[in-house]
Amino acid sequence: MSLPLLAVKPRTLDQRVVSYEVPAEDDPVIYRLTDATDAAAVDALIWAAYRQIFSEHLILASYRQPFLESQLRNRAISVRDFIRGLGKSEVYREQVAAVNSNYRLVDISFKRFLGRPTYGQQEQIAWSIILATRGLEGFIDALVDSDEYQQNFGADIVPYQRRRRMARPFNLVNPRYSDYWRNKEISLSGRSYYQARYYASGPLDKQIVRGAIPANFLSMARSIVVPTLDTQRHVARATSSLVKVPNTAQERDLPPTPVKPVPVALPYRYLPSQPKV
């Protein structure tokens, strides 16, 4: 038996205040299935749902849900059921739920499914109890079936951020994982193998690792090493000994060329050979 939702006192957030703002380009686009009259409009609605639930940097071809898309295109399910299916998919479980604590997962899910942040730690604790007792699928069902979701989005509207005044939408907040997970990844990547692994009895040091390795392991590894040969050198030596180079020298009976003295103009020839006294 799951525990009931604890009472939470709401806070004054942007979406709870009456707006007198002038419409601008930053206002969210509302996607309704009833307004989608052609295939292009349905595709735009589907991609808007992916951007809202999976976040912009998670829209990959491998993350798409073709079964849910086919049902939505054929009007077999509503937009609310499509959003429910995206929240229960393995992509949301692995990329969002598995890398965050329960408190941060509640806050992220509220931003993506209800379009608002949580009312502080009190609401995060209350909904984390639902997450712990009902699991991720029960938590998604509780969000989608809540009165707040029905009043703001109904069955045909893709969830969006209500009254956004931030520089970036909720679904684009990066990173998608919490500080604890990021610091854990950094600590594991900067430590050695002996420091990263732990047993229940304590840290795994080098002595325990060496005890698990047989004494003759290194000698056995050296014995199976195949000696390397310079194949190119041996092939070149074998081929060069078999190749016969033809003799291209031409043998002719030519008379010897006579050598005659040739007068040479030596330098400083204008000087007398014997100096005059």
UniProtKB/Swiss-Prot annotation:
Q: Which GO terms describe its biological process?
A: photosynthesis
How does this protein assemble? The phycobilisome is a hemidiscoidal structure that is composed of two distinct substructures: a core complex and a number of rods radiating from the core.
> Could you tell me where this protein is found in the cell?
Cellular thylakoid membrane
Q: What is this protein called?
A: Phycobilisome rod-core linker polypeptide CpcG1
- Its domain of life? Bacteria
Q: Which PANTHER family match?
A: PHYCOBILISOME 32.1 KDA LINKER POLYPEPTIDE, PHYCOCYANIN-ASSOCIATED, ROD 2-RELATED (PTHR34011)
Native source species: Thermosynechococcus vestitus (strain NIES-2133 / IAM M-273 / BP-1)
**Which of UniProt's keywords are assigned here?**
Antenna complex, Membrane, Photosynthesis, Phycobilisome, Thylakoid
Q: Which residues form the PBS-linker domain?
A: 11-189
Indicate the principal place this protein occupies in or around the cell. membrane
Q: How does it sit in the membrane?
A: Peripheral membrane protein
Entry similarity comment? Belongs to the phycobilisome linker protein family.
Does the keyword Membrane feature in the UniProt annotation? yes
Give the GO cellular component terms, alphabetically: phycobilisome; plasma membrane-derived thylakoid membrane
> What is the protein's known function?
Rod-core linker protein required for attachment of phycocyanin to allophycocyanin in cores of phycobilisomes. Linker polypeptides determine the state of aggregation and the location of the disk-shaped phycobiliprotein units within the phycobilisome and modulate their spectroscopic properties in order to mediate a directed and optimal energy transfer.
PROSITE patterns for this protein: PBS_LINKER
Q: List the disulfide bonds.
A: none
